Amino acid sequence: MWLGRWFNRRLGTSLCQTPQLADDVSAKGMIPPRLSVPVRVRCVAVSAVLLLSPLGIAQPQTSAVPAERLAAREWFRQAGFGMFIHWGVYSQLGDGEWVMQNRKIPATTYEWLASEFNPVKFDAHEWVSLAKAAGARYITITSRHHDGFSMFATRATTYNIVDWTPFKRDPLKELADECQRQGIKLFFYYSQLDWHHPDYFPRGGTGRASGRPENGDWTRYIAFMNQQLTELLTHYGPIGGIWFDGMWDKPDADWHLADTYSLIHRLQPAALIVPNHHRAPLPGEDVQTFEQDLPGANTAGFNTSTIGALPLDTSLTMNNSWGFNITDTAWKSTREIVGYLVRAAGSNANLLLNIGPRPDGTIQPEAAQHLREVGKWLQTYGTSIYNTHGGPISPRSWGVTTQRGDTVFVHLLDWRDRLLAIPLVGVRVTRASMLGDGTAVDFEQTPVGLRLTLPSVGAGEPDRVIVLRTVKGPQ
């Protein structure tokens, strides 16, 4: 993951900036970056040619996309919420997933650390059940992070959790089987960057203290990755897709993306490719993801401000670390997390919320508690998140709108007044009520919008939702 800030900046509320709101300074999106992290080499412009609209939004690719992928993209677009998991050898040191880079640990020393990894309390049923209780529709887990250690059974290298550790089990296989049983889709995070493999050469902007010889075969490294991807796509049943990360480490390298993307779609036609390269979408990709940011906001400083036509995804840490960090107690509140989830939905994006399990395989109580509280909120308000898209009113400082069919959901995240005026025009509102208890909301339509009179100013809820039933036609 991108680890590009050395300071901790926290906001109580995340506000969204979209192309439609370029003139609304109060509505600019921000998701806090994380602590104590190295600066990544920025990517150069990609080689693909994108046609941009005046608003800076990439137009859909004209090449035909198979029906299976179109259906998978639509499923993803409607999913709303997923659970991200960063877990690996680095968890043992309790200092985040970049500890090998940050502490300049040589590869041989890190190999010894890997040989001690034994997460005996890992329970796939417990993890998937927690995701389900949280209301997550999918899980994305690190199959291999930048440290180069494979968290699955692979014949491409012995440097994996089955062959190298006393654990001798394949947690990804157990997780895949449990996801199938509980009806949750599984995505595999896969790092293109590798601080361990000798053929990751020439070296990129990171991993230079690993002690590897200054030689290697890049073509052989690409073949190694494709062999592992083939294993992930053939040994674990149907998967949701591959979530790539790390290409930014060598922006000028030939990553042979066309070959790799073709391989993935050939092995599993419905598998989605989700690249975390922080650029406008490239041919063959299926989802555009934004790290620690809402789409188009780029408050983190490394995401693109171009919003493409693909389904959107925004990933977020629950504190300031992706991997387990024993000293990171800067947990976001459930209110903040719900706010990010709602603002993502109002920006046509899913929220992928991260947890970093402990080295023994257990999940920190704080993370589990927040997930269950989000799940409880979704039990009541999920209808305004799942299977919706951004509503007719662009994101504002007070909140966002989402929509399904003729129903518009007005999300009040930061509004403590009984009166609210919104610029809703072109439709006639037939009924307004509060989601949850169904209390009627008085309203008046005017030529310039809709005036709403709420039953109360609110009692500190993370999000008050007004349901508007509409029909097309004059107001």
What spans do the regions from the language model cover?
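Mature catalytic domains of secreted/periplasmic carbohydrate-active enzymes
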Residues: Q59-Q475
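Bacterial N-terminal signal peptides
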Residues: V44-P54
